Amino acid sequence: MEVLMAERADLVFHNKVIDATAMKRLISRLIDHFGMAYTSHILDQVKTLGFQQATATSISLGIDDLLTIPSKGWLVQDAEQQSLILEKHHHYGNVHAVEKLRQSIEIWYATSEYLRQEMHPNFRMTDPSNPVHIMSFSGARGNASQVHQLVGMRGLMSDPQGQMIDLPIQSNLREGLSLTEYIISCYGARKGVVDTAVRTSDAGYLTRRLVEVVQHIVVRRTDCGTIRGISVSPRNGMTEKILIQTLIGRVLADDIYMGLRCIATRNQDIGIGLVNRFITFRAQSIYIRTPFICRSTSWICRLCYGRSPTHGDLVELGEAVGIIAGQSIGEPGTQLTLRTFHTGGVFTGGTAEHVRAPSNGKIKFNECLVHPTRTRHGHPAFLCYIDLYVTIESQDIIHNVNIPPKSFLLVQNDQYVESEQVIAEIRAGTSTFNFKERVRKHIYSDSEGEMHWSTDVYHAPEYRYGNVHLLPKTSHLWILSGGPCRSSIVPFSLHKDQDQMNVHSLSVERRYISDLSVTNDRVRHKLFSSDPSGKKKERILDYSGPDRIVSNGHWNFLYPAILHENSDLLAKRRRNRFIIPFQYDQEREKELMPRSGISIEIPINGILRRDTILAYFDDPRYRRSSSGITKYGTIEVDSIVKKEDLIEYRGAKEFRPKYQMKVDRFFFIPEEVHILPGSSPIMVRNNSIIGVDTRIALNTRSRVGGLVRVERKKKKIELKIFSGDIHFPGETDKISRHSGILIPPGTGKKNSKESKKWKNWIYVQRITPTKKKYFVSVRPVVTYEIADGINLGTLFPQDLLQERDNVQLRVVNYILYGNGKPIRGIYHTSIQLVRTCLVLNWDQDRNGSIEEVHASFVEVGTNDLIRDFIRIDLVKSPISYIGKRDDTTGSGLIPDNESDRTNINTFYSKTRIQSLTQHQGTIRTFLNRNKECQSFLILSSSDCSRIGPFNGSKSHKVTKESIKEDPMIPIRNSLGPLGTVPKIANFYSSYYLITHNQILLNKYLLLDNLKQTFQVLKYYLMDENGRIYNPNLHSNIIFNPFDLNWCFLRHDYCEETSTIISLGQFICENVCISKYGPHIKSGQVLIVHVDSLVIRSAKPHLATPGATVHGHYGEILSEGDTLVTFIYEKSRSGDITQGLPKVEQVLEVRSIDSISMNLEKRIEGWNEHITRILGIPWGFLIGAELTIAQSRISLVNKIQKVYRSQGVQIHNRHIEIIVRQITSKVLVSEDGMSNVFSPGELIGLLRAERTGRALEEGICYRAILLGITRASLNTQSFISEASFQETARVLAKAALRGRIDWLKGLKENVVLGGMIPVGTGFKGLVHRSRQHNNIPLEIKKKNLFEGEMRDILFHHRELLSSCIPKNFHDTSEQSFTGFNDS
């Protein structure tokens, strides 16, 4: 007090404008200087003055006082312009939906924020005495956000879930809202208005529960004698402000020395002077007392509580600090909930900071330290991992700019930047406390069409048969327009008169694979190719001018390589690999190969794992042409999908089982199915019976007779016709109500009048047209027996299969459809019921370490005869040949930009490559960006023979000779269209387009002699990596004429454009392909004429890494199917509507987020470790102590974090008192139990300690976290519990147990009408506390114990460091730092 008296002379003199916060500071300083009474007198005068002035000024608020900010018009216009550009990019396929949403939110958020910052200076300049300005900025009424909505713009709103609506409200409330804007703003504000009532009641209930937990805590003693403390240290990154907040008003638990000099003693309370001294002396760690370490659970002592926040002195005896604490935490809740109401659901988000260039100049940085990436808006950028120094050289000075780690660099090296240009973007710090959540966003296709993607897409290996694909890097998905050929009559046709059209398709789960050969029948040569159906098939080549030929390879193999005839590949036996020959021509008849061709499945990366299906073929015996249902009858089926194959990919389980057969019989029940559009009229009724060739719909007739079932689904009608007989059963017949039963041949109907035996299997199904009547349809069944599989010897040479150390094959039969699955046949196609698969296997013992084998596809040409081989290597390293730059092999044509890289090729050995050097050939290198290896596509002079055996064709030989004469022509000729990846300079970066290749073979090989161009369109697809692969068969797709765009080019097209356009290439919108300017629609080049192109329109969708692609390559998607699922993190709006439930979750100890582990789990782990190390009595005690300390600190941090993020300051000690009550119980466990407590009983920790010491026998217990509700129901007083919840239950239990209520708390006394033991009523306890003076001895004993305890905790670090992540001491320090990271 002497100090205060001395300072009374120095009166505080203020001469400045005071707002609300300054007023608070002033009042607290006044209290410090003059005490309570004097201050209240001063404040009274201020109040009177204020009212006088307000009356004199008489501020009124009219609508004219709301002045809109002048710069608003062009700011909004600018933002709209940016949104428009963004929309365009999304349309072109440069950014995807999530990036677009994210960027548009940030554009509008930034605009809105900018307007908000303009508001204050604008008012200050134009109209400083504006009532809105005065009220808002003095803190009297209305905050910046509300005024901003009145005079700025409302901006982005959030919907009731706290998600963003990406349509901003551009007008403010002064200008008035349009109808749309009004609806959007009401949509989000409902949360604010309606929920306010609910939320207020929530906050009230929270307060009630909090007070319930701590109402009995009263200051009852000056010092409890504890010698523990929690250390706070200024070292670890605490700001001074936070340190001061933490320390002021606490009491020291230990003396503090500076060297040998003691600067503060134990039990001294910390004032601002002392804190400053600590900061100047840089005291290492300061032990303070907190409610956590007070010795009793039912009261608290003055020193552990510290100063009372009201009058800056140690708290008085008899103060009800518990209730104060409950109210301090609950009350801001009510304020905070109201806050949503004030801003009406306006969204707040975070924007990133920018680094701008200090002056004009050239920018330079070290490119090794950065890594190219996409920003979250889809712009290309560099990511720097460590601090990056960027130099900007202008004419005379060099500026250095430091860019912090994890930032995005938005410029390229050596680029010229202008002053104030944004060169880097710093990630928005995590200091903004926004709750992140992971969101799935599905992108749906907006048109019908065929899906195409780059080879980048890979399966998760577990999903060989599923449709979950992951994208490892950014690429496009294209939806090529055109619908599948359905069973309706095609109203238009693309084919010219007399074209030959050959459509054959087979259906494998909605993939309509078919082949389309379209030509004019003038000049024809036949080509043979193996087809899935195994029929020899004509491919027709056309010499007669620029007409369209679509001819396809069939396999998805890597890099078909053409080797010269000297190569030694034909040897069939090699160790560790085997080679399967395919016959292209008549030789097939000589070998006993079954009619149905073998289809080989090799993944695109060429790597096969054990038990992968290598090849399959479809036995024609198990092919049906009509729809129907498969049933297994008595078969045991072993579904191949085992438990471990099913991996949950981000929550979605998807796989497609194939069923492996154990027994050799299954049944097929045919039915006819028609799928009609929803609008079409149907000529027959449901459950009616029709004959063959009845007219069902306008142009559809039934092929079989029978019972009709009509089912209406979304947008279409499914009409089924069941063939077979119909029986009306008598009353005695019991027919199962199930979907249907199979009856074996030879069984008749018992007890019925007509006894009829069936010769074959039948399927009986009960049909109920009305409730009472029903009849039975008996349908014929086709029975299939399954053979034991084909003899492998007929497929492959015998010696191949007998090798021991080789790759082996097993034959497995799969049924393709599940039991009872309906099978739909598409128009005129056949359905394969059983597929025979060859499964790879190899010897585990010998090659135990080998997980995967590499397959390659090799094509060998010998004198017009072409053989294809698959080679499967068990060899570990795929790299078998390295060619250096000066090597003779490399002296072919390697493009300049890639010539200095080492060419590593995966499929050739050295000897084999050498044979190529005798003939001059072109080597075209494709850089494979994923792996650091390159692959060759070699066009040697034997290239032309690849076209196939042209029987006696002259032009063929001419071509070969002319190539030999002038080796440069084929190079020039084929390098143009073959494998060029045009870089399209797009709006702000270059995207690689997906290209297809054509090989142009000119008859006389002269460019200007265009009339006689001989075109073979070999249909390749090239992906964004420059890898080439064959697509699968061309689908049976009918184009709509409107989907094709004709694009006319100049006649000089061949010289200029042939490098840009190749057949099958995908062209994004807005790309220049001719002199006339950009192309209008995006699409795929379908037909190339000399002077024009036909482009099939396609829609690109961009997808980034980590996205999931649904569906299969080449699958036909209908409108509205899901294409891609993006998973992205977004911050929920930082509304306290999310904040209050968070506080409540922490206090009720529910698990909050999946990321931070639930504290309870952590607690259990700790308990086990420590008990194991220290043995029983100490182990339980210390285990419980440490766990409790840990969880207490982290709970306090979590609660503070939520409140701080809302700008609400609550003193830590209030939260501590409450947390102490939640964590002060332990749960008695069973083992080693003495008879004192029953297992599962909750007792206080201190009580457990004392009982354990008294009994000198360990009680086993573990720490437990109670929520506030449970804590309220587990107090010492049953009257208080009964008045809280579940009155009857609590009272009945108390009566049964014979509980005694000592009436220590406030509530019990209030209920019974006694005097409450706080404040003046506290005197009743004074004589008790006097008795404590004569117990120094007991305290000393306790101190002995406490000393040992403290030793164990703080000094024996070696002992604990093995089981405690950080020792106790540090954890508390660090977590106190954590308290204050708001």
Curated annotation (Swiss-Prot):
Cofactor, how bound (note): Binds 1 Zn(2+) ion per subunit.
Which reactions is this enzyme annotated as catalysing?
Answer: RNA(n) + a ribonucleoside 5'-triphosphate = RNA(n+1) + diphosphate
Q: Which SUPFAM superfamilies does the record match to this protein?
A: beta and beta-prime subunits of DNA dependent RNA-polymerase (SSF64484)
Q: Where does Zn(2+) bind?
A: C224, C294, C301, C304
Q: Which CDD domains match?
A: RNAP_beta'_C (cd02655)
This enzyme's EC code(s) = 2.7.7.6
Q: What GO biological process term is on the record, naming one? A: DNA-templated transcription
Quote one Gene Ontology molecular function term. Answer: DNA binding
**Gene Ontology cellular component?**
chloroplast; DNA-directed RNA polymerase complex; mitochondrion
Q: How does it assemble?
A: In plastids the minimal PEP RNA polymerase catalytic core is composed of four subunits: alpha, beta, beta', and beta''. When a (nuclear-encoded) sigma factor is associated with the core the holoenzyme is formed, which can initiate transcription.
Function (record text): DNA-dependent RNA polymerase catalyzes the transcription of DNA into RNA using the four ribonucleoside triphosphates as substrates.
Q: What family does the entry list?
A: Belongs to the RNA polymerase beta' chain family. RpoC2 subfamily.
This chain belongs to which protein, by name? Answer: DNA-directed RNA polymerase subunit beta''
Q: Which organism is it from?
A: Liriodendron tulipifera (Tuliptree)
Q: What is the lineage of its organism?
A: Eukaryota, Viridiplantae, Streptophyta, Embryophyta, Tracheophyta
Q: Which gene encodes it?
A: rpoC2
